[in-house]
Amino acid sequence: MSVKEHNEEDIIGDELQNSRQLSIDCDSVKISLRNTYWTKDYTTGIKLFIKHMKRENDLLIKDIKFYNDFVNKFWKPTLNNLQKMEATNSMNSRLLEVMSKQFNIISTEQVERDCKIPLQELRDLNESFLREAENDLSSRYSAYIKDLVAAKEALIGCEKRVQSIYKLKKANTPVENSSSVFDNGKDSAPLTRLNFVCEFPYTLDERLKFEDCDQFMSFLQTLKGKVILEKSVFSVPGLSNQSFQGRSLIKELKKLEPRLNLSLFNIDRIGNEFIQLGIIQEYSLSFYSSKVSQFDQEKYYYWNSEVLATQESNGNAGNRKKKSYGELTHSDNEHEEKSNVSSIKTSISDWIRKVSQHDNDDCDAAGSTDMNKNEWKSLKQQLESSQDIFFSKCCQLEYSKVQLEKTIYDYCKNYSKMEDGIKRALESSNMMFQQKCEKFTDSPVCSLQEAQLPQETANADVRGFFLRDNGIPFRRWNILEASDPVDACKEISIKSEKFFCGSEINNELAALDTLGAIKIILRQIEKEPNANKVIQSWHRDIDFVRVSNLKRDLLGEFKGSKTTENTNSIITAHFFENSHSYVTNDLVGLIKLWLLELPDSLIPSNHYDDLIKAEKSLTSLCEQFPTSSLRFLQELANHFQLINSKYSLPPQTIQDLFRDNSDIDIPLAHHFVRRTGLQNPIDIKILSPTLSTFFINERTVETLQTLIANRITTATTATLTEPPTIIIKDTTAPIHSTPKPPPNDKDGHFIPRPFKTSSTPTTPERPKRKSGLFLPINVNDVPST
């Protein structure tokens, strides 16, 4: 065994032993209404909270009914009947007198005053609170959903603008070498054969993630093959008489992924995602409408053949003998250069054919495809306008989300007090009634154990700490323009960047930019001279209103920034240099909010069970974490250890941050690791000491640094070819006549426009040959290698 392996085993062994010694009691985990009914979709938790209040109200109604029946159906009729009876002799008279006196020991007026009326008043108050909460939460949730849909539509609007600009680039790029603007550099199907807009890696659901377009298309083909098609009695004109019910689609999805979340919210979300991507369309006369319908399990849909035919056409490309107009054919026997020319030719013809189908038919196959300066300026303004709308909708969505969360929290907090009052009132009325009954019986009615209120079953409700939907992360599209003095034109490119809050960290470049922003915030926290403020900020719950304001301020800086790289780290540094209105508690809250908004927790959720079983230490599991997670964990571990050393705090201070959860609603450990589905809040007993041991261990930073260095050393650097450049001419180029293809012959002869050459030397940045088509492209579209 090497010295390195021996040291690693020592670290893992010490970590396991220390975490077991630091186990916390159940009493230190506060489970209340404020941290019980939280779900990522909000509506499930709200419904369970309403159900909980109704159940409490039912307890009051039951006891009220019992006292009412006891008085009106039993005790009063008994007394009345005794008084009506006539004695036949002195013995009967004496017996009736004794019994009447004994029964009068329990006064019906006292039972109603001491037992029934207090519960009735509490019931009325509870029902009033219930109605108010139900209406208010419903209103807040409706506003949130409305803003969520508006933000999603604004995002789609931006993507369509970018997509329309990008599609123009197809006339200048071979199909084999083009890659989608939305694939983050991953290999995917060519955009010329893809009609939906999404980013890869693409997350359809927490259980359905796809690394590239091929994987996604393969999944869709499998799903399509399993969904049973039906024939309608009355077919829709213009569509084939084959459709399927939305319920059938969800059923087959569940078979493909048994752990799929089948809440109504999630089902509707997945269905709407399919509709928005153009994978399915409603089988009805709305086919002729431009309005996008909402998914409904009871409605019928049909597969979009234009999208799903992609995989089939790719698979059968080698067997096709006859090519149709605008299609790309592959032949292993053809020369490589000839294939490339064919690719360019067919891509151009395909683009012209699609453009000719638009409402504006000014440009046809024989017309000019040049774009002058004014046309490009108009497209750019349209994209900027769409981005302004998207930014506004994202800010509104953040506001409505915080208002919804604050409303849920306030009602849960207030009802928690009411619930205690209900419990005390029920116990008091039971005790009063028991005392009155014991006077009548002259003996104890029941033991103290039997007098306890009925307990709720363990699985009655979902229990879990705060969860936040990461919503729709804001992104922007930077338009880069560079002048070409030789050709008197501009080179245009488009680059996309995401705001760090709510965005995934699995993309290396985006993760490094986010890491830079997080580092700046942590350094800002470490400037705080008061150690108690730093410790209390990490211990307290998030002040969502102030932190949301800080987040929106940073979002505004991100939107208005003119930088094109590392924007998150640059705007964060600039913001805190000039703004002093936020305190340490706000900065720590922003870090916590960022952790909660990650699509997957910083410690990947698929290792949650491994940590709960405590069979492996967190350090040993780090070898299986993504490199981006290791970088952030290293930075946070370094931060906690720096706090400990800088302020000369006792060793147990950082441990207490994780272990003492008695006076907070969101345990600190919950920010770092969360289960994808339901989780038992008592798991915090294991997770808290595990994380505290991990972060305070002096060898953790060194271990993580070694793992990161090994990943960088072994990683292979992909060689990327220079993407094609697009040109925006300052003046309109002369029109070159090109013969139109015969109307009934899709294989008609196509003559490409002549290329022009530059007298300047050839360089990678300025190739000598440039296409005669002056069209904008996206620099993110790196040809696949």
From Swiss-Prot:
The modification N-acetylserine is found at S2. Residues 520-702 form the Rho-GAP domain. It comes from the Eukaryota. It is a peripheral membrane protein. The keyword Membrane applies. Residues 313-340, 732-785 are annotated as: Disordered. It comes from Saccharomyces cerevisiae (strain ATCC 204508 / S288c) (Baker's yeast). GTPase activating protein (GAP) for RHO3 and CDC42 that binds membranes through phosphatidylinositol 4,5-bisphosphate. Plays a key role in cell polarity. Modulates the RHO3 distribution at the plasma membrane and its polarity during growth. One of its GO terms (biological process) is small GTPase-mediated signal transduction. The modification Phosphothreonine is found at T760, T762, T763. The record marks K559 as: Arginine finger. GO terms for cellular component: cell cortex; cell division site; cell tip; cellular bud; cellular bud neck; cellular bud tip; cytoplasm; cytoplasmic vesicle membrane. Phosphorylation at the C-terminus negatively regulates the activity and the polarized localization. It is found in: Cytoplasmic vesicle membrane; Cell membrane; Bud tip; Bud neck. The modification Phosphoserine is found at S759. Present with 1720 molecules/cell in log phase SD medium. Signal peptide: none annotated. GO terms for molecular function: GTPase activator activity. Residues 31-463 form the F-BAR domain. This is Rho-GTPase-activating protein RGD3. Keywords: Acetylation, Cell membrane, Cytoplasmic vesicle, GTPase activation, Membrane, Phosphoprotein. InterPro entries: Rho_GTPase_activation_prot, RhoGAP_dom. The keyword Cell division does not apply. Residues 329-339 have a biased composition (Basic and acidic residues). Pfam families: RhoGAP.
